Design a protein with these regions (language model features):
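C-terminal luminal/periplasmic domains and tails of membrane-associated envelope-modifying transferases
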Residues: 418-524
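Hydrophobic alpha-helical transmembrane segments in integral membrane proteins
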Residues: 215-220, 379-419
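TM-adjacent membrane-interface loops and short helices in multi-pass inner/ER membrane proteins
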Residues: 103, 242-283, 290, 297-303
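Alpha-helical transmembrane segments of multi-pass inner-membrane proteins
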Residues: 2-22, 30-44, 58-94, 99-185, ...
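A membrane-periplasm/extracellular boundary helix in multi-pass inner-membrane enzymes
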Residues: 157-160, 165, 177-236, 244, ...
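Membrane-interfacial entry segments at the cytosolic side of transmembrane helices
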Residues: 53-60, 137-144, 185-202, 369-389
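Transmembrane alpha-helices of multi-pass inner-membrane enzymes
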Residues: 117, 168-176, 321-378
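Short aromatic-rich membrane-water interface segments that cap or initiate transmembrane helices
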Residues: 92-108, 233-242, 283-296
Length: 524
């Protein structure tokens, strides 16, 4: 029962459909950490009855189940079949799929994490997967189930149209080929068994077939759909990663030693005028972990972090790893690591938990005998888990309070339907969201121009979007700060030329901001 309960908590973060504003990532992040802490508490409560192998099995099954169920959701989304589920499934246009993770590359990474776990199950001998808590199947039936799951997960990956997912599949194929070689060793049930190669080959074939078949079945053009089509067509220049990385490298050159500061990339991108092409959106992440560390913390910190990681990787030599459980852990980290070179999965709860779990697997003992827990370590883990749950609940409550101003009055909690802004003014957390709402619901006048101007300048570091910039421009002109208004106007024109043009056309004298904040905050 312990393993089943822990499995439930470890699977849920991948399937959570809810991400209420104003900052969509907050609730999934808190939910993921609460689930992980509850899983730890379940294991702690079981005391010495839980073996390391049981925990490994539970993690692998949770990754596999999360990927399989998400693949089903993704296929429903791809064919427009999610309306019946209401709020319990995210809804997309036909031809799109991202499960309940709300982003195609995150969905594709989950598919490949699930495939890594499936290969581990395929390679594991009966003494690893047979357990009174898990159903057992005859070998042929078990292989058949693995084949079906490989096809399902690969179809989900293909439905995502994620180029990242395609590259990850190639990386996993290379890693598996390395680990299948006799020189990789044979200890610990390594992935040298022929069924592993068969399952991986089936997964690759299923991906290729699904890439061609899914668009046809959905009434779409196969030449314009899928990861291969997106690889061939590429992105527009202003939205490509090459443009983005070029801008980030320029920003690094401006402040190479200490960087721009944590969370300041979006501000840095807005206030900088580039000589070449400009990335045409708010830029709050470098979409490459080493570059992000460099632009926000400086080159010395980035070099130290990346150098340490490279040294640890070289010492561990994962390409020589003979143990299948550690191979699975390295596979999970490889999928997340590759994704981190193109985006920022480690900013999201499910991937944080997966990365930490994979690191734990690398440290776990290879023995399958029951090991009694050290009492001090056991209770320390329990106390840490309780602290995490308590902290997340406190943060969730304050986030709920901060979000009230973003709702229409009738949808707010009863105690916050009137004087909402005043009542949430003093909450200790999520003050950026509260102050952003204060700014965007205020009417600019000569009396409050100074306060609005100061607040807008501050909020520019939180969300440099058109309505914030326009308040800076209007309040600056009211205060007679013409040079400052011109400074930000040039940057507004460079960053958001269409919005700037509309602002020029519509403004006559002062332009008041909207009376209600939006339901979400751009890129936050």
């Amino acid at each position: 029962m312990t393993a089943i309960t822990a499995f439930f908590f470890l699977t849920l973060p991948w399937l959570n459909p809810f991400s209420p504003g104003p900052t969509a990532a907050v609730v999934p992040l808190l939910f993921s950490w609460v689930c992980a802490a509850l899983a730890v508490l379940v294991v702690v409560a079981a005391r010495a009855q839980t073996t390391s192998q049981t925990l490994v099995r539970t993690l692998a099954l949770a990754w596999l189940a999360g990927a399989s169920v998400s693949a089903l959701i993704g296929l429903l989304q791809y064919f427009g079949g999610t309306a019946w589920a209401g709020p319990w499934l995210n809804h997309t246009s036909i031809g799109e799929a991202y499960g309940n993770l709300r982003q195609r590359n995150q969905f594709a990474t989950l598919m490949n994490i699930g495939l890594v776990a499936l290969l581990w199950w395929t390679a594991s001998p009966p003494e690893v997967y047979l357990n009174k808590n898990w159903p057992s199947l005859p070998p042929r039936m078990r292989f058949f189930v693995c084949v079906m799951l490989a096809m399902l997960i690969s179809a989900g990956n293909a439905a995502s149209s994620s180029r990242t997912g395609l590259v990850q599949l190639g990386l996993l194929s290379v890693l598996t080929w390395i680990w299948l070689r006799p020189s990789a060793g044979s200890k610990g049930h390594a992935w040298h068994l022929r069924p592993v190669a068969q399952i991986l080959l089936i997964a690759l074939l299923a991906y290729a077939v699904a890439t061609a078949a899914l668009p046809l079945l959905a009434g779409l053009d196969p030449a314009a759909s899928g990861a291969w089509a997106r690889l061939k067509s590429g992105d527009t220049v202003c939205s490509s990663r090459l443009t983005l990385w070029g801008n980030v490298l320029h920003l690094i050159s401006q402040k190479p030693w200490l960087g721009w500061g944590w969370g300041e990339l979006d501000y840095a991108h807005f206030v900088t005028l580039y000589s070449g092409e400009r990335f045409c959106d708010i830029l709050d992440n470098a979409h490459n972990l080493p570059l992000h560390l460099a632009v926000e913390f400086g080159l010395p910190v980035a070099t130290l972090a990346c150098g340490t990681g490279t040294w640890l990787l070289w010492r561990a030599r994962p390409w020589r790893e003979p143990d299948s459980t550690r191979q699975m852990a390295w596979g999970i980290l490889a999928m997340i690591g590759l994704h981190s070179l193109l985006e920022y999965p480690l900013w999201y709860g499910p991937f944080q938990i997966a990365a930490l779990a994979a690191i734990w697997l690398l440290q776990a003992k290879k023995t399958e005998k029951t090991q009694p827990f050290n009492a001090a370590v056991l209770y320390t883990k329990g106390l840490v888990a309780i602290f995490i749950i308590a902290l997340c609940l406190v943060l969730a409550w304050h986030y709920q309070l901060a979000s009230q101003i973003y709702l229409s009055p009738e949808n707010r909690m009863a105690a916050y339907q009137a004087d909402t802004q005043k009542k949430i003014q003093g909450i200790p957390f999520f003050q950026d969201q509260v102050r952003f709402a204060e700014l965007t619901t205020a009417d600019l006048t000569t009396e409050n121009a100074k306060a609005i101007h100061a607040l807008a300048l501050d909020m520019l570091h939180f969300s440099p979007e058109p309505r914030v910039i326009e308040l800076i421009l209007d309040s600056a002109r009211l205060l007679g700060k013409i040079d400052e208004a011109d400074f930000y106007a040039r940057r507004y024109q460079a960053a958001f030329p269409e919005a700037y043009g509309r602002w020029l056309v519509t403004k006559s004298g002062l332009v008041n901001p909207t009376s209600q904040p939006g339901g979400s905050i751009s890129n936050h």
